[in-house]
């Protein structure tokens, strides 16, 4: 039956595409109503089919059992109640200041129940502002509880703690069963088809863009309209897990890959994941830490201050007074990696959202492996401790302590760090921003060529700058991986050749690394070498490189179509995460308009690399 469901999703997509092709002319002549009726009928059939499958959970589990057997996901899937938990919109917690007295009372009462036992966690500190790497827009409305907290904070000389969860985030139960998650993707497939029809209708009824504006790589399909992007965001924020992780990866791409309007919407994916109801959250904690986990804490805030793809983060205070951040994994996420990735790739493939040359099968395998590692919080704790040891004497970076007694397979607790994420660093002086970026790039080179052990997630919120100590805390080590010497030996020579302006060297080393086969077209070879040379310009410049003024994005954009269409083999598996980290580090430098000397930095890394090896380059 699960196979029938997937066939249904694909069939609906093909139906939508066929209607688009055959009825475009009728749209121009006023046939919009006919199109809407066709779409509504398709949606009705889909919803009826999904309802027929409601009682068939076992067959779906059998369908995906063979996929699970290929991966070592030892945590058992939890049996949570199937009744849907009522969603709690942000407006029901943070009321508008102009609401009536009766409504005010009822909402304040609900909020009081939600935060029962809450104490201001920052009242013991003075003159200290903490940020929680989420959407930082203000929240309207003041309750009696807010006023009381403000008074207490004023008496203690500190600012009150403020929830930084995005206003768009809603309290919604995580779909735990595979059938429940599949139904959400089925609804998304239908919605995308309807949205595509509507987009074609709008485009056919308005004049074409004559401004000659360049389209982004993922901006060529009616399935990727703004309305459909909204549908994607809503679904990803609800199901979370592997699907949401891909949306977060899209959110950190620049405008050359994603239309700026779509990028803004996908940015919400990074900041606006829904969060678990209290009942589901506490059950997850009790399952992992035992029923008496609260006895180890003086305070635990039941509303999370951050919600991401795999888990949500809560503020707590231990009995010894230390403030900690408790990351709780969403139930069922680890067990649903295979089905989530398959379902999402089906939706993206049918909507033509994946450009040619991405090698989806290879990409799927890489995503599965990375997500399986990120769901293992015991492994992440080990990675954090290893990085803490590697950077123990670093004057600028540090790693917060892991709290072992409150950590497990699905719960990771670390000390809470002060400061703010780098996306709020734009107001700092340019000299300070240059120093931050220089340290980030230097750390990136050390991770790859000295440690051969890299945290590969370049999310802004994984770098917290504390202006009081002038240090940066490094967070989130779930995406940490190692690199073999056989890989770094060749990769460092590719960068060296690019920095030296040696095109033949770039080509030779690229073939050795299996970026190219040696049988590509001349156009493909030139595009690949050009891209590497462009990326190596920062390490070639004798003068400080101006990341804010560089045209790297535009020039790489012009090469992407050729590389996607004429690539013969997928790139090395290691480069997916490596280039995500390096590209993200360059993007941070660009956003902060950094102007730093990188040539000396790379030459020092190159010299140290080979001096620490038994053999020299090309030996």
Curated annotation (Swiss-Prot):
Keywords: ATP-binding, Kinase, Membrane, Mitochondrion, Nucleotide-binding, Transferase, Transit peptide, Transmembrane, Transmembrane helix, Ubiquinone biosynthesis. Pfam families: ABC1 (PF03109). ATP binds at residues 309, 327, 414-417, 462, 476. Autoinhibited by the N-terminal domain, containing the KxGQ motif, that completely occludes the typical substrate binding pocket. Nucleotide-binding relieves inhibition. Residues 151-171 are annotated as: Disordered. Atypical kinase involved in the biosynthesis of coenzyme Q, also named ubiquinone, an essential lipid-soluble electron transporter for aerobic cellular respiration. Its substrate specificity is still unclear: may act as a protein kinase that mediates phosphorylation of COQ3. According to other reports, acts as a small molecule kinase, possibly a lipid kinase that phosphorylates a prenyl lipid in the ubiquinone biosynthesis pathway, as suggested by its ability to bind coenzyme Q lipid intermediates. However, the small molecule kinase activity was not confirmed by another publication. The chain crosses the membrane at residues 182-198. One of its GO terms (biological process) is phosphorylation. It is a single-pass membrane protein. It is found in: Mitochondrion membrane. SUPFAM superfamilies: Protein kinase-like (PK-like) (SSF56112). A motif (AAAS motif) lies at residues 306-309. It comes from the Eukaryota. Its EC number is 2.7.-.-. Adopts an atypical protein kinase-like fold: while it adopts a core fold similar to that of well-characterized protein kinase-like domains. The KxGQ motif completely occludes the typical substrate binding pocket. Nucleotide-binding opens the substrate binding pocket and flips the active site from inside the hydrophobic core into a catalytically competent, solvent-exposed posture. The keyword DNA-binding does not apply. Belongs to the protein kinase superfamily. ADCK protein kinase family. One of its GO terms (cellular component) is mitochondrial membrane. InterPro entries: ABC1_dom (IPR004147), ADCK3_dom (IPR034646), Atypical_kinase_ADCK (IPR051409), Kinase-like_dom_sf (IPR011009). Residues 298-487 form the Protein kinase domain. The active site is at residue 457. This is Atypical kinase COQ8A, mitochondrial. It comes from Danio rerio. Homodimer; homodimerizes via its transmembrane region. Interacts with the multi-subunit COQ enzyme complex. One of its GO terms (molecular function) is kinase activity. A motif (KxGQ motif) lies at residues 245-248.
């Amino acid at each position: 039956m699960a196979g029938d469901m997937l066939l249904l999703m694909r069939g609906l997509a093909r139906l939508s595409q066929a209607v688009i092709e055959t009825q475009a002319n009728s749209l121009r002549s006023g046939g919009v109503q006919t199109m809407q009726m066709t779409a509504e009928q398709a949606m009705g059939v889909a919803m009826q089919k999904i309802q027929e499958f409601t009682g068939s959970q076992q067959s779906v589990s059998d369908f995906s059992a063979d996929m699970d057997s290929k991966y070592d996901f030892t945590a058992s899937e939890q049996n949570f109640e199937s009744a849907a938990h009522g969603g709690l919109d942000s407006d029901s917690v943070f009321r508008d200041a102009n609401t009536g007295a009766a409504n005010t009372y009822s909402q304040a009462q609900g909020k009081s129940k939600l935060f029962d036992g809450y104490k201001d966690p920052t009242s013991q500190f003075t003159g200290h502002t903490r940020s929680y790497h989420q959407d930082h827009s203000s929240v309207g409305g003041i309750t009696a509880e807010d006023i009381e907290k403000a008074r207490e904070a004023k008496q203690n000389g500190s600012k009150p703690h403020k929830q930084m969860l995005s206003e768009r985030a809603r309290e919604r139960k995580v779909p735990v069963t595979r059938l429940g998650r599949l139904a959400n993707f089925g609804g998304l497939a239908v919605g995308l088809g309807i949205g595509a029809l509507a987009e074609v209708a709008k485009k056919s009824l308005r004049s074409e863009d004559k401004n000659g504006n360049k389209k982004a790589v993922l901006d060529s399909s009616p399935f990727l309209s703004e309305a459909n992007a909204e549908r994607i965001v809503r679904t990803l924020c609800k199901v979370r897990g592997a699907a949401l992780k891909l949306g977060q990866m899209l959110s950190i791409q620049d405008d050359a890959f994603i239309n700026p309007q779509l990028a803004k919407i996908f940015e919400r994916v990074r900041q606006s994941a829904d969060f678990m109801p209290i009942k589901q959250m506490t059950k997850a904690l009790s399952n992992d830490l035992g029923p008496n986990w609260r006895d180890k804490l003086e305070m635990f805030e039941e509303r999370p201050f951050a919600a991401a793809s795999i888990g949500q983060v809560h503020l707590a205070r231990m009995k010894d007074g230390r403030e900690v951040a408790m990351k709780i994994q969403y139930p069922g996420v680890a067990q649903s990696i295979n089905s989530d990735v398959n379902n999402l790739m089906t939706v993206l493939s049918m909507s033509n959202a994946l450009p040619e040359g991405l090698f989806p099968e290879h990409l799927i395998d890489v995503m599965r492996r990375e997500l399986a590692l990120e769901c293992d919080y015991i492994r992440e704790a080990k990675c954090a401790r290893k990085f803490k040891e590697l950077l123990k004497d670093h004057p600028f970076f540090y790693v917060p302590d892991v709290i072992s007694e409150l950590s497990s397979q699905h719960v990771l607790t670390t000390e809470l760090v002060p400061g703010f994420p780098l996306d709020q660093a734009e107001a700092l002086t340019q000299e300070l921003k240059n120093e931050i970026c220089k340290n980030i790039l230097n750390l990136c080179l050390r991770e790859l060529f000295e440690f051969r052990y890299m945290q590969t997630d370049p999310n802004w919120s994984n770098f917290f700058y504390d202006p009081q100590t002038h240090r940066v805390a490094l967070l989130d080590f779930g995406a940490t991986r190692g690199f073999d010497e056989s890989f770094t030996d060749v990769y460092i020579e590719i960068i060296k050749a690019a920095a030296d302006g040696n095109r033949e060297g770039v080509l030779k080393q690229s073939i050795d690394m299996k970026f190219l086969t040696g049988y590509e077209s001349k156009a493909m070879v030139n595009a690949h070498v050009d891209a590497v040379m462009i990326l190596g310009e920062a390490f070639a410049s004798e003068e400080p490189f101006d990341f804010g003024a560089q045209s790297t994005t535009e020039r790489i954009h012009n090469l992407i179509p050729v590389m996607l269409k004429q690539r013969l083999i997928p790139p090395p598996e290691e480069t997916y995460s490596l280039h995500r980290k390096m590209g993200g580090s360059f993007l941070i430098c660009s956003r902060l308009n950094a102007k730093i000397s990188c040539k000396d930095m790379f030459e020092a890394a190159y010299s140290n690399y080979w001096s620490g090896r038994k053999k020299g380059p090309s030996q």
